[in-house]
Structure formats: structure tokens, C-alpha cells
């Protein structure tokens, strides 16, 4: 059971920015007054914010409760994905995308940190490989789903964030 829980955290790591990609071409139609800079900020700011929050979460995970940190990261990730379903202003979409980056930054170091904490030797190395595989498989599947959902409505690709993080938040501890 521990292995499945740890693998599931790996599924979230590749998702930041994914929901924006399939709708980039339509954003000029959805937000006709949006500048190119604002649209570029949607993809770059979350990635930029991942870095400091990854470092902060890594530091906090050494001295604090990793589980609580994971729950906070997943909650921020879930809530930002959920909020995107209702946004109709570009500045709000940028702000909430930044929150997605913050949530992901908190989660990312924990995905491998848990493997290092719970496993040793060759088994640890194998688990790190599985984690990477799950990360990439999730990215492929979520990209296909987000692309399909983008054809229905531009808000719907953000469901990818909510579905994965909601699953984690509702699992028994």
C-alpha cells in the first residue's frame, strides 16, 4: 500500500502547465484584449514559482511533517485547478496558474523524498525508476485527456489538476 501511495504522488509531478498547452491557441479568442505577454505568463510564471517552492518544501520536509506538507501542496493544486473552471478574466487565470505552480513546487520534492525515506538499496533505485515511468505515463495520458477536454470547453482541461489531486486528498491515511 505504501508503494502505491508513493507512486501516486509521482503522478502529480508532471502536470503543472499541462492544462494551458491545449488552449493556448484559443486564448486570444477567449480573452481578445489579452496581450502576448499575458499569455506567455500563463506558461512561464507557474514554472518559475515551482523552483522557490520546491526548495522551500525540500527544506521544510527535513524539519517538518512531510504528510502535512503533501496535503497542503495537494490542496493548493486541487483548489487552483478547481478555481480555473470558473475564471473569466485573464489576470485571475494568471494568478491561479501561479498557485498551481506553488502547489506543484510543494509536491515535487516529496515524490522522490518519500522513496528515499521508505526504501533502501536496489529496491530504492527500482522505485525511483518506477516513479519516473509513472510520471511520464501520467503526462501522456493527461495530455490526451486535456486535449480532448479543450475541444469541449476551454475551462475543462483544468479538470486534470482536480481529478489527480482530489484522488490523493480523499485517500485514507
Predicted feature residues:
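Extracytoplasmic
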Residues: 2, 8-32
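Residue-level signature of mid-helix packing/kink "hotspots" within the transmembrane helices
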Residues: 18, 47-55, 139-140
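Extracellular/periplasmic helix-loop-helix junction of adjacent transmembrane segments
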Residues: 24-51
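Conserved MFS/SLC helix-loop-helix module at the cytosolic interface between two early adjacent transmembrane helices
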Residues: 52-85
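Paired small-residue
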Residues: 91-99
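Cytoplasmic helix-loop-helix junction between adjacent transmembrane helices
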Residues: 98-133
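Symmetry-related core transmembrane helices of the 12-TM Major Facilitator Superfamily/SLC fold
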Residues: 158-166
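Conserved small/polar residues in nucleotide/adenosyl-binding loops
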Residues: 167-173
